[in-house]
């Protein structure tokens, strides 16, 4: 079963651990993501959401385990993975257009930049048009609203043509009205470009509204390793839900179905409702995981596949 899932996957994560000293942050993470998915990731504060994102980006490497992008091991950060943070990654003294061109300027050899000057300029303008900033090319960051700055940051990533766009709480610093408009903008952009997006957020409403799939990461769970508190446990994927991919509008947040899903995810994060590893809510068709024998004691088994 795992081989067939692996063949369908753009991003493949298997038996991944991240340990700092004696602290286990990520504990045997298994994840498969296919091209074109918009995956949202939620979980309690400090559970390792941003750590997982840094591993995919290549800023850090797993202590153990395998991570593949299009079948190749993930190495140091490169243009195959774009990143947008909560803090705007803009150069203050460059225009909007100059900021978007900065990535190619820093990554390409001088002669290639010179040869492709018009092509790169056209590409920068194209992506700024995609993020609705075609009329703001000559403005500087201090002249832009928070939402506009984040759209510039997204265009900075897009011009590098990443296979996957990673977003770490990108709308967290925006006011509620701007945040909502940016959510709608991101959905339009995702549908237009067919991008693969991995979106980390602490906001359950945002995660359910945006995602085609929502993953819950948590270190609050039960297994067969003894009493909690006596065994160092890191975070696992405790839930993996497929979400509706029908046309979304702000009105979708007002439906009973939306509210029920929010409540279901909220209960999964709530430490008062810990689940045993064998009962994790892994509903997505690409969900899979392996467990060590000490986590779930099955006679004669060293791994448990589901």
Where do the model's predicted regions map?
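ABC-type ATPase nucleotide-binding domains, specifically the catalytic core motifs of the NBD
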Residues: 61, 101-118, 130
């Amino acid at each position: 079963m795992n081989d067939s899932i692996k063949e369908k996957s753009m991003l493949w994560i298997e038996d991944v651990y991240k340990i700092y000293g004696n602290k286990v942050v990520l504990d045997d993470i298994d994840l498969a993501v296919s091209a074109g998915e918009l995956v949202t990731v939620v979980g309690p504060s400090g559970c390792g959401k941003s750590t997982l994102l840094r591993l995919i980006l290549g800023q850090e490497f797993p202590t153990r385990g395998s991570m593949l992008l299009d079948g190749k091991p993930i190495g140091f950060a490169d243009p195959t993975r774009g990143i947008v943070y909560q803090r705007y990654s803009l150069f203050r003294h460059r225009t909007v257009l100059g900021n978007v061109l900065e990535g190619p300027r820093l990554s390409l050899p001088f002669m290639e930049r010179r040869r492709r000057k018009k092509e790169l300029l056209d590409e920068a303008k194209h992506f700024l048009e995609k993020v609705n900033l075609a009329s703001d090319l000559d403005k500087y960051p201090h002249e832009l609203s928070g939402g506009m700055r984040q759209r510039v940051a997204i265009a900075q990533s897009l011009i590098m043509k990443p296979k996957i766009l990673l977003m770490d709480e990108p709308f967290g610093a925006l006011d509620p009205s701007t945040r909502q408009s940016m959510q709608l903008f991101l959905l339009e952009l995702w549908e237009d470009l067919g991008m693969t997006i991995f979106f980390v957020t602490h906001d359950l409403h945002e995660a359910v509204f945006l995602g085609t799939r929502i993953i819950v990461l948590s270190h609050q769970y039960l297994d067969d390793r003894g009493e909690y508190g006596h065994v160092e446990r890191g975070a696992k994927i405790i839930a993996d839900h497929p979400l509706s991919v029908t046309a979304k509008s702000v009105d979708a947040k007002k439906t009973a179905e939306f509210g029920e899903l929010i409540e279901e995810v909220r209960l999964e994060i709530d430490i008062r409702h810990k689940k045993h590893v064998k009962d994790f809510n892994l509903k997505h068709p690409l969900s899979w995981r392996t467990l060590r024998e000490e986590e779930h004691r099955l006679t004669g088994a060293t791994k448990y596949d589901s």
